[in-house]
Amino acid sequence: LSMGGYGAMIHGLNHPERFAAIGAFSAAIGTEDEQEKNKLQDGPFDPYGLIRKNVAEGKKIPPVYFSCGMQDMLWEKVCHYEKFMEENGVDVTWVPVDGFRHEWRFWNLQIEKFLEWIARTDAYAADQKQHRSV
């Protein structure tokens, strides 16, 4: 959620082999210009550079569940990053939701949706219908 959504992307992209999926809700990810301005470009905290690096190295990026309320203050930046992910071949499930801002009401709903979306790998997985729809 918010800065944690940014953190989820950073951890998932720095260690893609450790994660089955990445969930980011209203992720506080700046634009590429902001990354450069803040001296983050192409470093371990640059979500754009990490995607480019993983693609260049042939690493499989985990599927990403990426959502944002359409009235969120981060909407434009989130849309920009979602487009960047798609352009770079990331398996992204994009969930824009009208009527929500940067708020817990949205995150509570989206966390539940994410848990329904993510592939189960535990002992009970065989008993559950597997699906990845939203």
Residues of each region from the PLM?
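Non-catalytic cap/lid and distal C-terminal segments of serine-dependent acyl enzymes
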Residues: L1-V134
